[in-house]
Amino acid sequence: MPGMKEIKSRIKSVQSTRQITNAMEIVSTTKFKRYSKLVTESRPYEESMRKILGNIASGVKNEGHPLFDGRKEVKSIAIIVITSDRGLCGSFNSSTLKELEKLVEKNKNKNITIIPFGRKAIDFITKRNYEFSESFSKISPDEMNKIAGEISEEVVEKYNNHIYDEVYVIYNKFISALRYDLTCERIIPITRPEVELNSEYIFEPSTEYILSALLPRFINLQIYQAILNNTASEHSARKNSMSSATDNADEMIKTLNIKYNRNRQSAITQEITEIVGGASAL
């Protein structure tokens, strides 16, 4: 049975850990509010872009475009995998990396290039000797849109040059403060959105020109949204994980205090018994 000194030391240790987890919970809550707001505010723009793209695609069903059409034979794919830079967020990153392994295994007969976003993804693919192109980590909020643009330019260019035949992105889609969904989707070639046209469209200067301008922007938007969603989900996961850790620390401190008080009471009782016994002997 541990002594009072040992129990007191454990209480101090748990209290110190609790201060850290509580501070991290507060920081993650602040960041979560910021990124969840960005996700919510940007979704109407994405939905409008998707609707416009659907209208155009439905109006030009007989006209092709490289980013729409795809290839008969897929020999090479690129995978954009998005994780966090830090841990302490439960199974958030491990689930993403397991999904990456599944996609790699499914396409093991193809040439695979991985574009890692986040320190956890970089470390994972480095240990497994996966082939990867440029990597991204420690990206500030102000740089996210710029980086999304760089990635989209790279994958579109390499797709047009037949270096990539398909491009996928793996990330966590933010749903609510308590939920995010692991998502793996193909972003190139783009799946034509199906919408019902109410009227015919006349395209100026040409359909090809409009699609050539719009489709790369749509891919850029998808990558940016994936980064935003994943970051909001990361801070949600860390906030919840640190909240749970803080609650567990409180429970442990309570249990240790009960043990300490019982041991202290037992020691006092024993001391009184010894004094009474000594007095009786006299």
Swiss-Prot record:
Function: Produces ATP from ADP in the presence of a proton gradient across the membrane. The gamma chain is believed to be important in regulating ATPase activity and the flow of protons through the CF(0) complex.
Principal place of residence: membrane
Subcellular location field: Cell inner membrane
Topology in the lipid bilayer: Peripheral membrane protein
UniProt record similarity statement: Belongs to the ATPase gamma chain family.
Pfam families: ATP-synt (PF00231)
Cross-referenced InterPro entries: ATP_synth_F1_ATPase_gsu, ATP_synth_F1_gsu, ATP_synth_F1_gsu_CS
GO biological process: proton motive force-driven ATP synthesis; proton motive force-driven plasma membrane ATP synthesis
Record-linked SUPFAM superfamilies: ATP synthase (F1-ATPase), gamma subunit (SSF52943)
Protein name per Swiss-Prot or TrEMBL: ATP synthase gamma chain
Keywords: ATP synthesis, Cell inner membrane, Cell membrane, CF(1), Hydrogen ion transport, Ion transport, Membrane, Transport
